[in-house]
C-alpha cells in the first residue's frame, strides 16, 4: 500500500487499482466477527490518502471463500478508481463470475453498459432560465384543441395541454438549447485555444470578441449544467455550486447503475430476460394492488366511541389561494410522474395555466370525474433495500404520481392536517405534526423497566404490519371515514380511479388499476393511514374500558 501511495503521488490523470488486496475495510465485508481492526483502519487510511473510490459490485457480497463446511466468506477482490475514471465511464458495470477453479470469484468489468430504455419527457429545471421559455409555454398551452369545446371536459383538456406543452418544450430545447454539456465543452475549448494564442501574439479584434463571448457562454452554460446535474442526482440538501457539480454528476451515475435490475428471483426460478421480469413484476403488484381485499371481520364503529369531524368545511369549494399555497409546497427537484412536470413548472407558469387548473378543480368539486383517469396515473419505481437485492421483496416500491393528482392530494392533505389531531388518540404520533414518535419509544422503555422491577413474567409484543400501505382495505377505510363524519363528496374524491405502471429498467409496464392500498409518496396517504390505524387503537381502548386489558401504570 505504501508503494501504491508513492506511485499515486507521482502520477496524475485517471487511475484504476484492481486485484486481490487480501484486506477488508468494513465489518460487513466478512461473514463472521473475527476482524483485524488495525489492518482495517490502515486500509481505510490508504483509500482516503489515494483519493480512490470503490466500484459497486453487482449482485454479490463476498468474493472469497475458505471452502469449508461452515465457510468464512470475505470481500477480498476489489476495483478502485479515481473520480476522473468514473466520470469518463459513467455506464460501467462490475460483476463477479462463478468460482470454478479457484477460491476467488473472478471480477468482470464492462466499461460501456449503456442502459437502453424509452425516452420519457422530463421537465428540466434550467429551462426557465433560458430566453423564450415562457413564450413557448404560452403558445403550447393556448394551442387550439383538436376537438370541439362542447365535447371536452376539464381533465381531457388539461391532459391535452400538458402533453402538447411537453412536446413543444422538448422540441424547443433540442433546437434552441441543445446539449448543454457539449456546448460548454466547445466554449471552454475556444477559450483555451485563444488563451494559448494570446501567450505568443496579440489577438485580433474579432478574436477578442469571440473570446469574450465564449467566456460569457461558459458562465451561463455552467449555471445550466449545475442545475441539470443537481436535478438528475435527486439531492436536495446541497445547493448548486461549482464545488458540488462533480458530486451531483457522480451521484446521478450511481443512481442509474444502482436502479438497473439485471435478474429477478421468483419462487420457481431466476429470470434474466426483460419481458419475463416485467411479467413477474406486473403479476406481483397486480395481486397486491389490483385485487380487492377480503374483509373477514366487521367492526361495529358505534361501540368504539370515535370522534366526528363535525362542521369543519372539508368539502367547501376550492379557492385559488389554497391551490397556490399547495403549489408553493411542491418540491422542485423530486422525480416527476408520468406527465414529466415538476413543481417548478407550476410555480413559473401559474399565470398561464391558472385558468385550466382552476377549471379542473371545479370539476372535481362538482363530482364531474369524466376523464379524470387521464391525470390520475402514477409510475412505480423499485428501489433496492439492500445491495444484494434479488427478489421483488428486496425492493421498495415508490410511486411517482402525476403532477395534477399530486397537487389535488396536496390540497386535500392541507385541509385534513389541521383536524387529524382531533380524530386520533394521543398514542398515535407518526405523520402528525407537533407530535413526536420518540415519545412512543420512551413509553416502551418505561414499560420494560417497570416490568423488570415488578419481577412479573411478561412479554412485550412488537407487531409489524407487512406492506401496510399497500394492503389497506378500501371498504374498511370508507366505512371508517363515513362514521367519522366525512361527507360523500370526500369519499368520492378518495375513491377516484387511479392506475399505476411499474417502471423496470426505465420502461413502463402494463397498467394496474387500484382496488386497495394507499399510494406511497401521496401527500394524503400518511394521514389516511393514521385514521385507519385508529380503528385497532379504538378496539384496544374499548377492551381496556371493559376490563379485558389493564394498564401497567396510570402514567403509561
Task: Name what the model sees in each region.
Residues 10, 22-26, 33-135, 139, ...:
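Metal-dependent phosphoester-hydrolase catalytic domains
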Residues 16-18, 333-341, 374, 380, ...:
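Conserved catalytic palm subdomain of right-hand nucleotidyl-transferase polymerases, strongest
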Residues 465-556:
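Conserved polymerase palm-domain catalytic core
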Residues 1-8, 46, 188, 193-194, ...:
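Inter-domain linker/hinge segments that demarcate the starts of reverse transcriptase
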Residues 4, 17-20, 43, 47, ...:
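Mobile genetic element proteins and their domesticated derivatives, centered on retroelements
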Residues 11-15, 415-428, 453, 532-556:
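Active-site palm subdomain of RNA-directed nucleic acid polymerases
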Residues 14-18, 22-30, 107-272, 316:
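Arg/Lys-enriched, amphipathic patches
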Residues 136, 197, 203, 233-393, ...:
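Surface-exposed loop/turn segments and immediately adjacent short secondary-structure elements
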Amino acid at each position: 500500500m505504501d508503494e501504491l501511495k508513492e506511485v499515486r503521488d507521482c502520477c496524475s490523470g485517471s487511475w484504476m487499482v484492481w486485484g486481490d488486496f487480501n484486506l477488508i475495510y468494513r465489518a460487513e465485508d466478512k461473514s463472521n466477527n473475527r476482524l483485524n481492526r488495525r489492518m482495517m483502519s490502515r486500509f481505510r487510511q490508504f483509500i482516503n490518502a489515494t483519493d480512490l473510490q470503490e466500484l459497486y459490485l453487482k449482485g454479490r457480497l463476498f468474493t472469497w471463500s475458505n471452502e469449508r463446511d461452515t465457510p468464512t466468506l470475505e470481500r477480498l477482490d476489489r476495483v478502485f478508481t479515481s473520480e476522473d475514471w468514473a466520470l469518463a465511464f459513467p455506464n460501467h458495470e462490475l460483476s463477479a463470475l462463478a468460482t470454478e477453479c479457484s477460491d476467488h470469484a473472478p471480477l468482470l468489468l464492462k466499461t460501456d453498459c449503456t442502459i437502453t430504455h424509452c425516452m420519457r419527457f422530463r421537465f428540466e429545471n434550467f429551462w426557465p432560465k433560458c430566453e423564450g421559455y415562457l413564450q413557448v409555454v404560452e403558445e403550447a398551452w393556448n394551442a387550439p384543441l383538436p376537438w370541439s369545446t362542447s365535447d371536452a371536459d376539464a381533465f381531457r383538456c388539461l391532459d391535452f395541454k400538458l402533453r402538447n406543452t411537453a412536446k413543444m418544450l422538448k422540441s424547443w430545447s433540442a433546437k434552441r438549447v441543445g446539449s448543454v454539456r457539449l456546448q460548454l465543452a466547445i466554449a471552454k475549448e475556444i477559450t483555451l485555444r485563444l488563451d494559448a494564442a494570446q501567450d505568443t501574439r496579440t489577438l485580433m479584434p474579432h478574436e477578442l470578441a469571440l473570446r469574450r463571448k465564449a467566456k460569457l457562454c461558459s458562465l451561463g452554460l455552467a449555471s445550466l449544467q449545475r442545475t441539470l446535474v443537481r436535478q438528475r442526482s435527486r439531492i436536495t440538501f446541497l445547493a448548486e455550486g461549482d464545488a458540488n457539480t462533480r458530486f451531483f454528476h457522480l451521484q446521478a451515475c450511481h443512481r442509474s447503475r444502482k436502479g438497473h435490475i439485471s435478474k429477478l428471483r421468483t419462487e420457481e426460478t431466476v429470470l434474466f430476460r426483460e419481458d419475463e421480469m416485467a411479467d413477474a413484476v406486473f403479476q406481483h403488484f397486480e395481486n397486491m394492488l389490483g385485487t380487492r381485499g377480503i374483509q373477514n371481520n366487521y367492526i361495529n364503529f358505534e361501540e368504539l366511541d370515535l370522534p366526528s369531524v363535525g362542521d369543519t368545511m372539508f368539502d367547501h369549494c376550492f379557492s385559488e389561494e389554497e391551490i397556490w399555497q399547495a403549489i408553493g409546497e411542491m418540491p422542485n427537484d423530486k422525480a416527476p410522474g408520468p406527465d414529466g412536470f415538476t413543481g417548478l413548472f407550476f410555480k413559473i407558469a401559474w399565470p398561464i395555466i391558472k385558468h385550466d387548473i382552476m377549471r379542473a378543480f371545479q370539476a372535481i368539486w362538482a363530482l364531474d370525474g369524466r376523464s379524470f383517469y387521464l391525470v390520475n396515473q402514477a409510475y412505480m419505481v423499485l428501489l433496492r433495500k439492500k445491495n444484494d437485492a434479488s427478489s421483488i421483496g428486496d425492493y421498495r416500491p415508490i410511486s411517482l404520481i402525476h403532477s395534477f393528482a399530486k397537487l389535488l392530494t396536496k390540497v386535500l392533505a392541507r385541509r385534513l392536517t389541521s383536524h387529524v389531531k382531533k380524530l386520533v388518540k394521543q398514542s398515535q404520533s407518526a405523520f402528525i405534526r407537533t407530535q413526536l414518535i420518540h415519545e412512543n419509544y420512551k413509553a416502551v422503555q418505561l414499560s420494560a423497566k417497570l416490568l423488570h422491577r415488578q419481577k412479573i413474567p411478561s412479554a412485550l409484543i412488537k407487531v409489524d404490519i407487512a406492506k401496510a400501505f399497500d394492503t389497506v382495505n378500501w371498504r374498511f377505510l370508507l366505512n371508517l371515514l363515513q362514521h367519522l363524519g366525512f361527507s360523500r363528496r370526500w369519499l368520492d374524491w378518495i375513491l377516484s380511479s387511479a392506475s399505476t405502471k411499474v417502471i423496470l429498467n426505465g420502461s413502463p409496464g402494463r397498467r394496474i388499476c387500484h382496488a386497495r392500498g394507499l399510494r406511497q409518496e401521496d401527500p394524503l396517504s400518511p394521514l389516511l393511514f393514521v385514521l385507519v390505524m385508529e380503528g385497532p387503537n379504538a378496539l384496544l381502548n374499548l377492551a381496556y374500558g371493559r376490563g379485558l386489558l389493564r394498564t401497567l401504570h396510570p402514567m403509561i
